[in-house]
Swiss-Prot record:
It comes from Drosophila melanogaster (Fruit fly). It catalyses: dUMP + (6R)-5,10-methylene-5,6,7,8-tetrahydrofolate = 7,8-dihydrofolate + dTMP. The keyword Phosphoprotein applies. The active site is at C201 (nucleophile). Pfam families: Thymidylat_synt (PF00303). GO terms for molecular function: thymidylate synthase activity. Keywords: Methyltransferase, Nucleotide biosynthesis, Phosphoprotein, Transferase. This is Thymidylate synthase. GO terms for biological process: dTMP biosynthetic process; dTTP biosynthetic process; methylation. Homodimer.
Length: 321
């Protein structure tokens, strides 16, 4: 089903007009993006009340434990507006996951560099992977989604038909047993954690079908949530994944629920985020899938169109490696 943008949605309600005072009619105020306000409120809470902790990267964080946000995807797409989010990188990384790939060089070839720091020679050697080729991240997200339980060799090996294809199982269950409470996809595999350049931060997704409304919703559990850089990407990524699965199963997107464990702000992100907190959220854009796609593996970046995206400028934040 090809999604067509609609005008308004419950996540972007219009502010009430002021009472008539006999003067010229008041102009309607801009919509309020309540979903993004919840993200900003969580940032404020962490900066004001978070516990200062040292972490793996030695940068240090302000951290709280156990947070949740909810995004309504029925009439808009949750791409944050208080800073520009690089949607092409979000989409290309997700398509890389869906393809079961673990070679960061494939993303580099598309000018997407979000995995460069964790796949460099220096980083791999530091993590003890001295015999692993540059770019080979080990059995990370895509491998677990498509080949859970298979024996990992290198990023260049052919894993066709090996392991459990969790993504395919999710789609088949949505089609054939939509009320199942076990529509789950996990990237957390304790046997493979020691082989990964970086253990999965976003660990487990559960999908929920409302047959009454014909909607697909997703809840993500994320063990480690970098609110400045990672979380805006993760929101958009799992929202896009839900749209894609809904599209190939004949459903409409519903809610994306984002549940987080260690929810943190890196200390070197505090000042940039204070700048972001001074900005007023704008309405979320819409996502259009431009053609009918039958199989999840057939999506290409060119199939996605983001419309009416009017974000504030980019804010520079350094990635903690």
């Amino acid at each position: 089903m090809v999604l067509t943008p609609t005008k308004d949605g419950p996540d972007q309600e219009s502010m009430p007009l002021p009472a008539d005072n006999g003067e010229s009619p008041s102009k309607q105020q801009a919509p309020v993006n309540r979903d993004e306000m919840h993200y900003l409120d969580l940032l404020r809470h962490i900066i004001a009340n978070g516990e200062q902790r040292m972490d793996r990267t030695e940068v240090g964080t302000l951290s709280v434990f156990g947070s949740q946000m909810r995004f309504d995807m029925r009439n808009s797409f949750p791409l944050l507006t208080t800073k520009r989010v690089f949607f092409r990188a979000v989409a290309e990384e997700l398509l890389w996951f869906v393809a079961g790939k673990t070679d960061a060089k494939l993303l580099q070839a598309k000018n997407v560099h979000i995995w460069d720091g964790n796949s460099s020679r220096e980083f791999l050697d530091k993590m003890g992977f001295t015999g692993r080729a540059v770019g080979d991240l080990g059995p990370v997200y895509g491998f677990q989604w498509r080949h859970f339980g298979a024996q990992y060799g290198t990023c260049d090996d052919d894993y066709s038909g090996k392991g459990i294809d969790q993504l395919r199982q999710v789609i088949d269950t949505i089609r054939n047993n939509p009320s199942d409470r076990r529509i789950i996809m996990s990237a957390w595999n304790p046997l493979d954690i020691p082989k990964m350049a970086l253990p999965p931060c976003h660990c487990l997704a559960q999908f929920y079908v409302s047959e009454k409304r014909g909607e697909l919703s997703c809840q993500l559990y994320q063990r480690s949530a970098d609110m400045g850089l990672g979380v805006p990407f993760n929101i958009a990524s799992y929202a896009l994944l839900t749209h894609m699965i809904a599209h190939v199963t004949g459903l409409k997107p519903g809610d994306f629920v984002h549940t987080m464990g260690d929810t943190h702000v890196y200390l070197n992100h505090v000042e940039p985020l204070k700048e972001q907190l001074e900005r007023t959220p704008r309405p979320f854009p819409k996502l259009i899938i431009k053609r009918q796609v039958q199989d999840i593996e057939d999506f290409r970046f060119e199939d996605f169109q983001i419309v009416d995206y009017n974000p504030h400028p980019k804010i520079q934040m350094d990635m903690a490696v």
